[in-house]
């Protein structure tokens, strides 16, 4: 079974690309827009999926919000060290012993550095890591880069 949880506070409903040569018309993006996109693009009829949309500040999430422990987290949130650490500390309570953390905007070196400082501070073991970097807002790649790290809470 795949248990998927999506969370956002929808604080940037009209977020636009920084590059002027990219023309995307994004207006009034809300939780309803996200749910509609899910319904149009994901077929769960033949697959064992549990998809939940959690609306609100991700730093307030806890084990109570999840039916299953999480083994993949895609963090695409506030890039301040305070908010990233706040979320990362909370996520430890609802992740499996081995889990994958994907951090968006890895082209911003500080985002990767913040994540690595958290990993060290929590004593997590890195089983695998990779930085997927590319040009800023690359529509054919990872937009602003990804940092992928497989972590273990135990020392193995």
Q: Which residues does each predicted region cover?
A:
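S-adenosylmethionine/decaboxylated-SAM
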Residues: 1-156
């Amino acid at each position: 079974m795949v248990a998927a949880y999506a969370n956002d506070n929808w604080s940037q409903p009209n977020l636009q690309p920084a590059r002027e040569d990219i023309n995307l018309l994004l207006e009034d993006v809300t939780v309803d827009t996200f749910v509609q996109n899910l319904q149009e693009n994901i077929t769960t009829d033949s697959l064992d999926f549990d998809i939940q949309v959690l609306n609100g500040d991700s730093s307030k999430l806890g084990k109570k919000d999840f039916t299953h422990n999480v083994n993949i987290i895609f963090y695409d949130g506030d890039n301040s060290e305070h908010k990233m650490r706040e979320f990362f500390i909370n996520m430890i309570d609802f992740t499996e012993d081995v889990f994958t953390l994907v951090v968006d905007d890895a082209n911003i070196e500080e985002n990767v550095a913040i994540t690595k400082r958290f990993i060290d501070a929590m004593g997590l073991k890195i089983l695998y890591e990779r930085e997927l970097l590319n040009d800023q807002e690359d529509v054919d790649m990872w937009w602003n880069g990804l940092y992928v790290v497989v972590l273990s809470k135990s020392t193995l």
